[in-house]
């Protein structure tokens, strides 16, 4: 089931991931929401090495970063992003793929899921394994999120 009649701007606001714009929401065969997003932040076309904004698209890529559920239901993100050519002659990087603070380069998990997982392990779960299972993450990712959360908390003192 595809829902194209909803306002993309409203859906983007509801998703709440800065820099991503909702293009389409559909239900898969199991009734799970599949949210197709594109990059809505022009700064993502900036080369991570030299900072020059690119205007030359090299290709496209699709990633599926995991995110927090929407209420009790999981949400599957499908990010249709662009691969850019860096046009700066002095830059050693030939090309790069869009990334955002909410979904960093090569990340398979949104920063908000990492943050929620780390906080959950610190406050609600008796061990990292329980938190990892609850959030559907691997133990190393859940542990890293917990360490980040703990480090941030301890640094304040």
Regions found by a protein language model. Give the residues of each.
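Short, conserved DNA-binding cores of transcription-related domains
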Residues: 1-93
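Short, positively charged, Gly/Tyr-enriched micro-motifs
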Residues: 51, 55, 62-157
């Amino acid at each position: 089931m595809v829902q194209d009649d909803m306002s993309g701007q409203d859906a983007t606001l509801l998703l709440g991931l800065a820099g991503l714009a909702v293009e389409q929401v559909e239900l898969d065969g199991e009734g799970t929401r599949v949210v197709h997003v594109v990059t809505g932040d022009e700064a993502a076309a900036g080369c991570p090495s030299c900072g020059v904004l690119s205007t030359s698209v090299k290709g496209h890529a699709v990633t599926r970063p995991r995110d927090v559920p929407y209420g009790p239901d999981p949400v599957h993100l499908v990010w249709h992003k662009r691969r850019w050519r860096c046009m700066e002659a002095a830059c050693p990087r030939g090309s790069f793929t869009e990334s955002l603070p909410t979904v960093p380069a090569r990340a398979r998990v949104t920063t908000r899921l990492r943050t929620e997982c780390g906080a959950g392990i610190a406050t609600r779960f008796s061990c990292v394994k329980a938190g990892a299972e609850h959030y559907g993450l691997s133990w190393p990712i859940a542990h890293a999120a917990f360490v980040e959360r703990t480090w941030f908390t301890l640094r304040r003192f």
